[in-house]
Amino acid sequence: MKTLRHISRPGNDNASIQRDFRIRLLAAFLFIFLLFSILAARFVHLQIYKRDEFTAQAASNRISLIPTAPIRGEIVDANGVVLARNYPAYSLEIIPSQIKGKLDDTIAVLKTLADITESDLNRFQKFRTEFRSYEKIPLKLKLTPDEASRIAARLYALPGVEINARTFREYPYGELTAHFLGYIGRISDKDQAKLAEEKLGSLYRGSTHIGKSGLESFYERQLHGLPGYREVEKDAYGNIIRTLRTVPPQNGQTLKLAMDIRLQQEAVRLMRGKRGAMVAINPQTGGVLAFVSNPSFNPNLFIDGIDSENWKALNENWQKPLINRVTQGLYPPGSTFKPFMAMALLESGKITQSSVIPAPGAWSIPGTKHMFRDSVRSGHGSANLSKAIQVSSDTFFYRLGFEMGIEKIRPYLAEFDFGQQTGIDLPNEYRGVLPSPEWKEKRFSKLPPERRRWNTAEMVPISIGQGYNAYTPLQMAHATATLANNGVVYRPHLVKELLDHNKQQITLIDPKPQRILPFKQSNFNYVKAAMAKVLQPGGTARKIGVGLKYSMGGKTGTAQVVQIAQGKNYNAAALAEQHRDHAWFIAFAPMEKPQIAIAVILENGGWGANAAPLARGLSDYYLLKLKSGGDHDIPVDNRNKTGVENPLLAGSGTVRPSENKITEAFRTIHNPEAAHSAASEAAP
């Protein structure tokens, strides 16, 4: 059988190949056409529909906004004397990411051109852990003109190194104003997070510092101001070609205080070498006239970051100079509490102005053997309320306080703002402890029920300002001012005016009364007259009444730090200094329309009469010199303008804290069991 084979013809093969070629060519053409169509459509979209957007983007790559930080507002005293100011200087700064080669090599070169100290290097290394590598980190602040010139001549060979003009903050009176002015510091991550949370981050573009404490923190928004900016054009390399527009910043407002710095200087002089606090208030306005917490510190150390050595010296010093004793020191008020107890006894009807009761040398709760002793072993015989205040009888108040009880007497004491913040324009004021059964139950919740419950005997020491009582010197001055002003309550305040230089506007802090206590005028008159007798013969502060050229009311107070066992006598010489009694004195003057109310505490200062001369000295200076125009001396700055020359610590009469032996922790409360309660419960 023969096999038939198909034999293709050349013509047929060519036709097939040509047909396939045409199909492929058409497909390629269509594909290319489609691509060009897409490109054309995209081109039209970009050129026509997205033109404005890309034009704006191109401009943004070329045009930048550079923020301009506002100048921080100044703080001045009542006469315009500057207490916190600004001054310009050059700062040597490094951008680590732009350094060519090793950073240490660059620093070594800079050390040949400027006096870069070990402290400068320590601060720089600390900042490196807090700043990003592309941020400017200060290596040396406040270059001298010669240093700036030498470095400027070498900048071409030092990439990543800049000299920038900065505005620096300064506190010319140093430690005299540290605890109420506070200080500013560099903006931290915590600060930035808080600003972002409050949606205020945009206000701090270009700013490097923020208020950290005191008035600098409380009035941060007013002092800081609003930033401006420069709109500039840059080339492809980021260099500024020209400035297109400038919007100036709105500088911060100036704070004007109610205080005369001369009175503050006198208060600091009186407290020199002593631990404690002194605060004075104008009862007619609430304006703070003097504010001393001693020992103090140099706030200029904190502005650009305190070095570790100085921080350790301050933080570990046994005298605790960083504590603001005026608003955060908690102490039992001792017998300075008695005038306010007297108002409670009179207003409640427990006694009258003519009531006379025994005031023996010791008293016991009926049915018990424990004796509560008077400071005078022989007692005071029989006494009315006026005499009990004049001679400071303890047993008089023991008995009446116990009989009345804490729940009945507490509302009257609360009217004087004991156990509450006064509302002063400073951050972190402690509210103190005005005890109650509810307070004790909550505070000692981890103790057995029988120890948590209120014991009626606890009212006995509370009646004379001991026990769980714990108040700040500011609270005592505020209560004294309220009593002196017949129950008219003003909020204590440091700032009396805000000066806005941008708007040419002055805002007054209007001293309107917060409220008026619902107490009888006759009772105010009676208690104030009794306080005047404290300075007269027979009174506990009779020595400072000698030669007094104006009328004054006052009350001494001796606050126990440790309890004395039954049958034992108090012997200060046998006690460690930190266990000795605190000395208190409160006062107001003159009796008619008082102009000043004062509270003084000397830690471990002994009898209350030891604090009285300080109040007399401050009152004399205010009423006889300042108010009469007798002192025209111009206050002198404590240091020069650019160098920190003050010692680290001041006011304590001691050597630098780094040379002090660290001893026992700062004590404020006499009762070991109540100490921790006041510290935690009294804070905000």
Task: List each language-model region with its residue ranges.
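Beta-lactam-recognizing serine transpeptidase/beta-lactamase-like catalytic domain environment
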Residues: 2-12, 84, 234-246, 284-336, ...
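Periplasmic/cell-envelope proteins involved in peptidoglycan metabolism and beta-lactam response
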Residues: 1-308, 330, 350-358, 407-417, ...
